[in-house]
Amino acid sequence: MNLPAKYRVLVITLSDRAHRGEYEDLSGPAIRQRIEEFMKSEGWEFSIDLALIPDDTAELEKLVKSASPVYDLIFTTGGTGIGPRDITVEIVRPLLSKEIPGIMEYIRVKYGAEKPNALLSRGIAGITGKSLIYTLPGSVKAVDEYMTEILRTLKHTLLMFHGIDSHLKNQ
């Protein structure tokens, strides 16, 4: 198998208040910036789309289902906590064909050692359709922490996802 000629990335922000215009979404653009930097450093062609939706189960499910055949990477931000409107994990998990628990567990443990509240995040990662999906918390600080760790493994994850054995010396 081959890597895509151009990576398509979708960043979905879930926030009732940002969707209503009560404040500006900063987390989605923060993810976009980190992905842009990563893709450029790898010399990969890419496009990134942003979506801002309310914390709505039907809307998130419809968006992920329609995006998973089209996008290579999907990132969500928001809705991974334990509040009554935090619905991301409940919607995304049933859509996964494979879950990748290690990366999110590692992030929670690493940052939770200093900030126990970080252990309340329920973010998950996995494969849905033709996409890798990562569900991140909604704060800009948490996005930065999560992206730092995700990007350390993303190239290898993409190679594995596309059936390329990066351990072979000829590749």
Kindly label every feature range from the protein language model:
Residues 1-171:
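Non-catalytic beta/alpha edge segments that cap or flank active sites
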